[in-house]
Curated annotation (Swiss-Prot):
Its cofactor is Mg(2+); Na(+). Mg(2+) 2 binds at N598. This is Beta-galactosidase. The record marks H358, H392 as: Transition state stabilizer. The active site is at E462 (proton donor), E538 (nucleophile). Na(+) binds at D202, F602, N605. NCBIfam families: PRK09525.1. It catalyses: Hydrolysis of terminal non-reducing beta-D-galactose residues in beta-D-galactosides.
Amino acid sequence: MTMITDSLAVVLQRRDWENPGVTQLNRLAAHPPFASWRNSEEARTDRPSQQLRSLNGEWRFAWFPAPEAVPESWLECDLPEADTVVVPSNWQMHGYDAPIYTNVTYPITVNPPFVPTENPTGCYSLTFNVDESWLQEGQTRIIFDGVNSAFHLWCNGRWVGYGQDSRLPSEFDLSAFLRAGENRLAVMVLRWSDGSYLEDQDMWRMSGIFRDVSLLHKPTTQISDFHVATRFNDDFSRAVLEAEVQMCGELRDYLRVTVSLWQGETQVASGTAPFGGEIIDERGSYADRVTLRLNVENPKLWSAEIPNLYRAVVELHTADGTLIEAEACDVGFREVRIENGLLLLNGKPLLIRGVNRHEHHPLHGQVMDEQTMVQDILLMKQNNFNAVRCSHYPNHPLWYTLCDRYGLYVVDEANIETHGMVPMNRLTDDPRWLPAMSERVTRMVQRDRNHPSVIIWSLGNESGHGANHDALYRWIKSVDPSRPVQYEGGGADTTATDIICPMYARVDEDQPFPAVPKWSIKKWLSLPGETRPLILCEYAHAMGNSLGGFAKYWQAFRQYPRLQGGFVWDWVDQSLIKYDENGNPWSAYGGDFGDTPNDRQFCMNGLVFADRTPHPALTEAKHQQQFFQFRLSGQTIEVTSEYLFRHSDNELLHWMVALDGKPLASGEVPLDVAPQGKQLIELPELPQPESAGQLWLTVRVVQPNATAWSEAGHISAWQQWRLAENLSVTLPSASHIIPQLTTSETDFCIELGNKRWQFNRQSGLLSQMWIGDEKQLLTPLRDQFTRAPLDNDIGVSEATRIDPNAWVERWKAAGHYQAEAALLQCSADTLADAVLITTAHAWQHQGKTLFISRKTYRIDGSGQMAITVDVEVASDTPHPARIGLTCQLAQVAERVNWLGLGPQENYPDRLTAACFDRWDLPLSDMYTPYVFPSENGLRCGTRELNYGSHQWRGDFQFNISRYSQQQLMETSHRHLLHAEEGTWLNIDGFHMGIGGDDSWSPSVSAEFQLSAGRYHYQLVWCQK
């Protein structure tokens, strides 16, 4: 044990937090989570241990701007200014100091290992009592599961130790410091340490004791570590559970270890042995260790699909059977290996349906509770995810247990990121930083290696490629050869990774960056000598209204076996709740706390909002990742299962044929599909309707029974096909009433019964419509070529750092947002059965014509207004965001009804999950509340739209909202939006894709850009 004078001044004088060679003082060795049961049955059933006591709850807390400002008296008693805070928590969430959101840029001046003198410091204290029996015998430990970023610990005024690495436990022996009666802990937490240079992750920078604190009492002679692994024969019919157990304390000949394996209430195998292992070298064996091997016949294998778990109980006892203590863990029989260029689980090639997940809560910051963790897992499973990457640090220890039990594959990632260094490997190639990096990797492995859900180790994130990575890669491969190692830094295919694991590589497009080229994922596989599998560690940047082009990745994954999926960036928006002057909550992002530097809304890249409400993009991910694929051939549906291990036993296939959303025929068939098998379903003769319309066949896979992760009736997969229709021509009924055209100096006015249309001759716009005396428009109907910029349109562009390549900057520079319409033509003609208005406009900016729009409005005797639009786009202007029409309707109706793709928001490059049907939703549901306002709520493939007294028919895309595109564009946060008068309608003949391969470079695929020079669309607008 390192002995240091207890005084605060002496401890601070050492400045351990600025010495990369000091990552801990007196911290105990890493190991799997312990409970020290004194009853093996309680260990088997995972009951709460009487030897494990939580110290979570109210602690006393005082904040200081620097550690030197803390008075020496704090070691002995609470300070007058101390407040009460809940542990675990981040002190920034209690109003102390400010959270800082930055992605790459370090929040402190870069001068490793030194940190600012102004180093916010939190002083925690807690008084507690210890059982008398704990003082009389054994060892009492204190466990801090997570403290950011470094801390010193005192107990009863005596210095105990020091720890850093905010995402792994720091555990200390308190036995020599405790006393009978009341005891007092004092924990000094520093916001910045040299460890902060290794924790430059894209997240909020927060501080404090943010994970659980507990006391653990272990006997003097104790289990100090245990590791379980599973081995198999070739066909997985026989297995061996290999358990290595290590003890500490007084080694006696009468000590024994028993390892028993349980499946529920049934003991499957058991073995007992004294300590003393196999001979290691010429000096002998480890006297304090023993390895037991238990044979298991026909083990039930673990996978994310079927997470079969056993329970291993490790008992330390005497030769006569007297139990000293027991530890236990869940065991999953599974094998991970790479063979022939494929990542295999239990001999089957995996397809990773993965997502990156930060530990984030809108109210609690980086504090995770079981309820939130389970909520995340259930949502992931319900949306066809089977894997999660712990980005970018080891997670709360409970997370892994839950992933074991519910079934998720885990990439466990070391808490190492040096993204802001120049070059990025400045520290990771420096041997002085090897001890700090080594602690972060080795302790992660020692804590988590018993979890079957952990199938891949990661050396960290965005830290370049240095010699330290190579050393740690070799250490892991030596200690745990049962798992592959991945690491993206330095080019995604270095010698420090078993898997090519690029981030944001595109399907077909190379990005030849200097030194670290990012090839297309297809090309990467074909590079000379490259035989590794490729799994994208990050892809499909889900920032705001995004995930366009997601289907293209999944087409490639299914086409090329060595493209084994990837991890979407990322799971949850990292917004935080703030309150306005009236106490109303609102969602905040970078800069909203006065934090500098900051990266604005770049912290919000989630498939779900911070409160776990899904983004519309989540449905697209669910659909593309679904485990059943469908093919229609004539009257036969071929259903293919992509499950590797699970036989469909809880699935019904519902099918329905509908004409324009009206059901004509339906049925259901139980699915009985073997893993990776097929089932052919013969449909009856399908009806052929006589009336015109779109005929669609829809299939949905429904789970009739609830599961551990879903309710009864859960829909897991679906597909639609448009069927051939009989040609049916419906002639419009002739009307003997002809609308009346009145011409004045300023207007053309058309009147039919109680309806009127007014066209302004100076502007050439439809300026007003009346039904009776009620005006229908608040603004004229006009062309629209822009949208409120998406995050993907903006990229990294901001006022102080313009990116001229960003879509929004190109549109601004070309004048798309400032363009004004010059009238070229406005004429009216009375036809035999209608009135025809013809207009033409040149949309210009600074004398340059960007678009020419020609329209005809044909108003007939039935009151229908048929609009045709022809647009010419200048060859030298950027491709526009949309080609459509917009106006502000006077009405505010409660509901929106449409025949088209839905029900969720969809865009041209993100619509495979949408279904063609007749949908009816509240107006409020047509708006997607992205925290950073932008274009939202589009519905594509629309044939009919009904809103209030209006109906539109044609082939178009629309969104309808209380917010104008102008307001969305000018507003920084969703809570600042205000409902405008009436309703804004945007009807597009064409709309550009949204992109999403990444959010910092233009990523809309060429096929979804509006690159043609001419466009034509038409629609009919009528009043009900």
